[in-house]
Curated annotation (Swiss-Prot):
Annotated protein name in UniProt: Leucine-rich repeat transmembrane neuronal protein 3
GO terms for biological process, alphabetical: positive regulation of amyloid-beta formation; positive regulation of synapse assembly; regulation of presynapse assembly
Localization of this protein: Cell membrane; Postsynaptic cell membrane
Function of the molecule: May play a role in the development and maintenance of the nervous system. Exhibits a limited synaptogenic activity in vitro, restricted to excitatory presynaptic differentiation.
GO cellular component labels: extracellular matrix; extracellular space; glutamatergic synapse; postsynaptic density membrane
UniProt-listed PROSITE patterns: LRR
Keywords annotated in UniProt: Cell membrane, Glycoprotein, Leucine-rich repeat, Membrane, Postsynaptic cell membrane, Repeat, Signal, Synapse, Transmembrane, Transmembrane helix
Length: 582
């Protein structure tokens, strides 16, 4: 009994001694779990955007996820992650890493996701990824890789996705992916690859998606992919492919999408190019150099439900008819921007509308271009040129080699004339606009000058109207003569009193009476016949410039003086004739 009590006391003493030690260990572990400046969420540690140049050493050993992205790490040392044997994902993207030790990833066998994108890595040693055989996702994109080792991915049998996008790779070693039997996605886009060896993809029996876009391929041979029996999506857009062919004798039944947009494809090597892909559902051929597609190629597109053909140089002739008929019967998704690139008359017109409106497929090829030219709208304005006069010649007999003028030439001429008319109209409009602008600026800057110009313009208009009214009152210049047939009473009255009525007439005009004041001396001195009429001499002065109203009054007084002189002369001569009559 006493022995048991002593034993119990000893056990209690040991527990009391060990309790502080365990507590200190727990506290130190808690302090080590979340480094300074980092954010910890359970067993996930986020040390992002801290400008770190070294990986913190105080990370908990039980950490499951570590993010060190957007820092300034430059290299990964030997056993860099030793002690983090529970780590399952590691993000090291967007750093300055350029050197990775061959044993940097030792001790993290449970790692499933490794992100090393957007760094400065130019090469990897062959054994770099040997310690992380459980990787599912490996991202090496946006680096400076020039080449890959032949055993670069040796042992990565569980890898599902591999990203090598946006590097500087030129070649891919043969059988480099042989151990990646479970790989489903391979991204080799945005590199400088020109060609691929036949056995590059050997062993990749589960690959479903392959990216080869934005490389430098010039040919596409579907026989290069004989072992990709599970491939569903193949992306080869924006290369330099001009020829597509296939030399394989088996059917590629798994392929469902093929993207060949943005290449230089002009034609297909044979009618059986697409016969090896009977389950193809989506085909992208936009932005190439296709002018037409043959009927045999169209017949092989039996399974398509989505097609893209925009951005090609379609020639809207009879060769386009098979494609238009196929598009009309196609029930899947397609773009409506399939436009004609030639001939010039149809540039920018939808191919279906062109065939419908211009009857391209309804008539023979010999009259096709002629009918097309006649069907096109002609410009409304057509300049009429004067016809040169030629001497009449007998018609020449028709020759064998003579041909009628081409209607296409007439259409071109009318097209050019229409453009000239438009250009002239635009030039005239711009000229008027410039004149109005100058007038507006002058009016704003020199308002007094503009007022003076307006006043002068009004005065000129007033004078012009006055002269026109005088011209209307005054008939044209005619020959005037004095016709005087006095009676006996009038003659005696004029001789006795010195005054009498005098009548002159103007041919085709009117008559007026002029009172005369006989002055014999004036009559004797005036030896030329003077013809006076009612205001006619105003026309003789109409060419003179009347500056002011005072000048106009002066001219009117002169006219009255001349009228008096003419009247006296006529009266004197009438008196001279009287004795003769007597």
């Amino acid at each position: 009994m006493g022995f048991n009590v002593i034993r119990l006391l000893r056990g209690s003493a040991v527990a009391v001694v060990l309790a502080p030690t365990v507590l200190l260990t727990m506290l130190s572990s808690a302090e080590r779990g979340c480094p300074k400046g980092c954010r910890c969420e359970g067993k996930m540690v986020y040390c992002e955007s801290q400008k770190l140049q070294e990986i913190p050493s105080s990370i908990s050993a039980g950490c499951l996820g570590l993010s060190l992205r957007y820092n300034s790490l430059q290299k990964l040392k030997y056993n860099q992650f030793k002690g983090l044997n529970q780590l399952t994902w590691l993000y090291l993207d967007h750093n300055h890493i350029s050197n990775i030790d061959e044993n940097a990833f030792n001790g993290i066998r449970r790692l499933k996701e490794l992100i090393l994108s957007s760094n400065r890595i130019s090469y990897f040693l062959n054994n770099t990824f040997r310690p992380v055989t459980n990787l599912r996702n490996l991202d090496l994109s946006y680096n400076q890789l020039h080449s890959l080792g032949s055993e670069q991915f040796r042992g990565l049998r569980k890898l599902l996705s591999l990203h090598l996008r946006s590097n500087s790779l030129r070649t891919i070693p043969v059988r480099i992916f042989q151990d990646c039997r479970n790989l489903e996605l391979l991204d080799l886009g945005y590199n400088r690859i020109r060609s691929l060896a036949r056995n590059v993809f050997a062993g990749m029996i589960r690959l479903k998606e392959l990216h080869l876009e934005h490389n430098q391929f010039s040919k596409l041979n579907l026989a290069l992919f004989p072992r990709l029996v599970s491939l569903q999506n193949l992306y080869m857009q924006w290369n330099k492919i001009s020829v597509i062919g296939q030399t394989m004798s088996w059917t590629w039944s798994s392929l469902q999408r093929l993207d060949l947009s943005g290449n230089e494809i002009e034609a297909f090597s044979g009618p059986s190019v697409f016969q090896c892909v009977p389950n193809l559902q989506r085909l992208n051929l936009d932005s190439n150099k296709l002018t037409f597609i043959g009927q045999e190629i169209l017949d092989s597109w039996i399974s398509l439900n989505d097609i893209s053909l925009a951005g090609n140089i379609w020639e809207c002739s009879r060769n386009i008819c098979s494609l238009v008929n196929w598009l009309k019967s196609f029930k899947g998704l397609r773009e409506n921007t399939i436009l004609c690139a030639s001939p010039k008359e149809l540039q920018g017109v939808n191919v279906i509308d062109a065939v419908k409106n211009y009857s391209i497929c309804g008539k023979s090829t010999t009259t096709e271009r002629f009918d097309l030219a006649r069907a096109l709208p002609k410009p409304t304005f057509k300049p009429k040129l004067p016809r040169p006069k030629h001497e009449s010649k007998p018609p020449l007999p028709p020759t064998v080699g003579a041909s009628e003028p081409s209607p296409e030439t007439d259409v071109d001429t009318e097209h050019i004339s229409f453009h000239k008319i438009i250009a002239g109209s635009v030039a005239l409009f711009l000229s008027v606009l410039v004149i109005l602008l100058v007038m507006y600026v002058s009016w704003k800057r020199y308002p007094a000058s503009m007022k003076q110009l307006q006043q002068r313009s009004l005065m000129r208009r007033h004078r012009k109207k006055k002269r026109q009214s005088l011209k209307q009152m005054t008939p044209g210049t005619q020959e005037f003569y004095v016709d005087y047939k006095p009676t006996n009473t009038e003659t005696s009255e004029m001789l006795l009193n010195g005054t009498g009525p005098c009548t002159y007439s103007k041919s085709g005009s009117r008559e007026c009476e002029i009172p005369l004041s006989m002055n014999v001396s004036t009559f004797l001195a005036y030896d030329q016949p003077t013809i006076s009429y009612c205001g006619v001499h105003h026309e003789l002065l109409s060419h003179k410039t009347f500056e002011t109203n005072a000048q106009e009054d002066t001219m009117e007084s002169h006219l009255e003086t001349e009228l008096d002189l003419s009247t006296i002369t006529s009266a004197g001569r009438i008196g001279d004739h009287k004795p003769q009559l007597a």
